[in-house]
From Swiss-Prot:
Pfam families: Astacin (PF01400). One of its GO terms (biological process) is proteolysis. Keywords: Disulfide bond, Glycoprotein, Hydrolase, Metal-binding, Metalloprotease, Protease, Secreted, Signal, Toxin, Zinc. Expressed by the venom gland. InterPro entries: Astacin-like_dom, MetalloPept_cat_dom_sf, Peptidase_M12A, Peptidase_Metallo. Its EC number is 3.4.24.-. The lineage of its organism: Eukaryota, Metazoa, Ecdysozoa, Arthropoda, Chelicerata. Zinc metalloprotease. Provoques deadhesion of endothelial cells from cell cultures, and also degradation of fibronectin, fibrinogen and gelatin in vitro. Its role in the venom is not fully understood but it might act as a spreading factor that facilitates diffusion of other venom toxins. Alternatively, it might be involved in the proteolytic processing of other venom toxins or it might play a role in extra-oral digestion of prey. The keyword Hydrolase applies. This is Astacin-like metalloprotease toxin 3. Monomer.
Length: 243
């Protein structure tokens, strides 16, 4: 890959579709951006170390969300308490994530690390502990659990029931360009709920395991043990439990 192509920004249409009524405040639909679609990008986690935050230090900057900063920092601390990841407010670093108030219900994050300004948009639909944790998972380099190449062994995806703008988040990736970390996790902070991104009155995903459920990330309050091990493995955290 050439330097020029690496820094080319892919213009991606992002649509975070929030359903009305009781689900109106939940994370739902398309919520991640990629600076470039390339073999560097895995679908369980980023493939190459060059796309991970150097030394596991995530540099961030707030440009809005004044009244939500304490909550966002609590989510960051939850990650730091369970992994070797640390979060540092920006001084003059070139590579950092800008955290801001997105338009209406727009929630998305640029994937992994780049040596320039990245975005983490937290609109009205993403201001819960779980939704912020989900987006920070993308910032660290985690993709959606339902995109794993082995996902069909664990869930049924109903593509016809998914809103067009969110179909990309349900695309299954191939084993030849994907490194899968750990077992499938029905409870992962990175998996969608069974009605997320749905067309009216339909289900987008069902589990194959009896007794398992799929819950919207906005209703969750922590990383699972498997989420933690995946991050620790991805960043090769010393002294931490890894796969």
């Amino acid at each position: 890959m050439t330097t020029m192509s690496f820094f080319t920004v892919l213009s991606v249409a992002v649509c975070l579709c929030i359903e009305a009524g009781v689900e109106g405040s939940r994370l739902n639909g398309r919520d991640m951006l990629m600076q470039e679609e390339s073999p560097l990008m895995e679908r369980n986690a980023l493939k190459y170390d060059s796309r991970l935050w150097p030394d596991g230090v995530v540099i961030y900057e707030f440009t809005s969300l004044r009244f939500y900063r304490k909550l966002i920092k609590r989510v960051m601390q939850h990650i730091a308490d369970n992994t070797c990841i640390t979060f540092k407010e920006r001084t003059n670093e070139k590579g950092y994530v800008n955290i801001y108030n997105g338009k209406l219900f727009t929630c998305f994050a640029d994937m992994g690390y780049y040596p320039f300004k990245q975005r983490l948009s937290l609109g009205l639909g993403c201001r819960s502990f779980g939704a912020i944790l989900h987006e920070l998972g993308h910032v660290l380099g985690l993709y959606h659990e339902q995109q794993r190449p082995d996902r069909d062994d664990y869930v049924i995806v109903y593509k016809d029931n998914i809103q067009t703008g969110a179909l990309r988040d349900y695309e299954k990736r191939f084993e030849n360009n994907t490194r899968v970390i750990g077992p499938f996790d029905y409870d992962s902070i990175m998996i969608y709920g069974e009605t997320d991104a749905r067309k009216s009155g339909s289900v987008t995903m069902k589990v194959k395991k009896p007794g398992a459920t799929l819950v919207n990330a906005s209703l969750k309050h922590e990383l699972t043990a498997l989420d933690i091990k995946k991050i620790n493995t991805l960043y090769n955290c010393p002294g931490k439990d890894k796969f």
